Structures are given as structure tokens and as C-alpha cells.
Amino acid sequence: MEVSKLSSAFDIDLVFPEGFSFFEPYLQYFVREVLEIGGEAYVSRAFGGNISGLFIYDEFEKYGTVFTRSRKVFDYFCGLKPFNFLFAELKTEVESEVYDIYSIDLENRDIVHRFSHEISMADDGQLSEIERFMVLAHPEINRRWTRVALKNGDKCFTVRLDGEIAGLGWVSFVRGIGRIHSLFVKPEFRKLGIGEDILYARLLWLKSNRARFAFSEISRNNAPSSRIASKAQMRPCGQVFQYYMKSLVSNEPLKR
């Protein structure tokens, strides 16, 4: 196995074998994003030169994602960097948190919803406010991420109540495919239908931009988001597993 570090998303021909990853249309996008926020990316190749794995890593947040079907490659990348948690499509015997990948065919499905709240799309002028909200939602977040995401074309949809952001959610759009992610509603504004409105706003935006397909990774521990996705006729089509350093090092079940 040969492993090389990427200095640019475009400095290497990232041609992946068929069936390599559900996220294949997004892999080059993910590499670009992680490098622009100060992270690292590595690619492994098997004998013959075919790509066998991809690893992206954010030093600030101490998290990584391994894209591979090989346990050998998975184990190698797990030991490459210190991390608090790591995502992978590969299921192992090690305890993990399961995320279901919900998807929807936007070409052949109508999106109909009655909104309860006004939805806005954030712009660069709201960058500082969005950054502060993202830190509230994810205290360990790499603060470079918000600026990079907006620069690269991600859209942030917000709902305001009482003069402040009550909730927001992000959407990426790559190669005709939408990724719905990073929803957060402040606790005091939950159960008001904000999350549902933000989901439908993103689906409608994608459909208006002729997206063929959309997906979202949702933890099985997040019952409200799973219910909202199901109500929007999104259906599970795959899984991602979140591993924690303690479990991988000890190879024991995670104690919650």
C-alpha cells in the first residue's frame, strides 16, 4: 500500500473504483474544503495504482473521515493522526454510533410544504453572526469552516425569531447532488416546526436548481431529525459509522 499526502484537491487524478463510496461525487469537494480550513488529506493506493482509501483530517477539531472498503486501510488511517472521533462507511466490530443516510429523488418527486416561518438565505454580510451561531451549536468547530463553506457555494438557510437566529441549516450542491447538513435550532425555539421549515426550504432550493438527488446523514440518536426527514419522504439508503478514539484504542464497547 502506497500512501501520499495531498497538497491540493486538483494535484492528483482522483479517479475512484466503481462502488468505492456512496460519497464519491463529493470526495474531491471534501478534500478541497478540508485543505482550505487548514486540515490534511491522504490517499492510499493498492498494487497497480488503484485508489484504495481516502482520509481527510481536521487538526483543530481532532476529527477525521476514512473512505475505504478495506479494513487494512481503515486501520492504517486510524493510527495516522490523533482524533476524538472518526467517520467511516466501513462497519467493524468496534462500538460506533450509527448514522443513517436519508435520500430523496428530486427529479421524480414534488416538494410541497406550508411554511410556518420566514426563511432567509445568509450572505457574506452575516458571516460573523453565522460564525457565532455555529460556535454555539458546535463549540469545538473550526471557525474557518463557515467562511470556506460560503465561499465554496454552500447555502445557509436561517429562521429569525425575536430579532435573533433561532435556527439554521446548510446545503451543499455538487455535480447535481445536494447534501443537507448541519441543522441546529436553539433549545428555546424547538418544537415550533423550525427544523421542518428549514429542511423543506433546502429541498425546494435544490429542486429549483435542478438537483437530481439529495441526501443527509442523520444519527439514529436524533429522533426528531429522522422523523422530519421521513415526513419529507426521504428514505434510508445507507449508513455511516462514528467511531471514538477510546473505543478504537481499547477495542471495547463505548460507555455512554
What are these regions (language model features)?
Residues 76, 89-97, 196, 220-238:
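Conserved active-site alpha-helix within GNAT-family acetyltransferase domains
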Residues 57-59, 138-187:
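A conserved beta-strand-loop-helix scaffold within acyl/acetyltransferase catalytic domains
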Residues 48-117, 240-247:
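Acyl-donor-binding surface of acyltransferase catalytic domains
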Residues 189, 193-201:
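Conserved acetyl-CoA pyrophosphate-binding loop and the N-cap/start of the following alpha-helix
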Residues 1-82, 139:
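N-terminal charged segments
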Residues 1-27, 108-141, 255-256:
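Short amphipathic alpha-helix that is part of the acyltransferase structural core
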Residues 180, 214-218:
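Conserved hydrophobic beta-strand within the GNAT/NAT acetyltransferase core sheet
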Residues 50-51, 164-167, 224:
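Glycine-rich acetyl-CoA-binding "A-motif" of GNAT/NAT acetyltransferases
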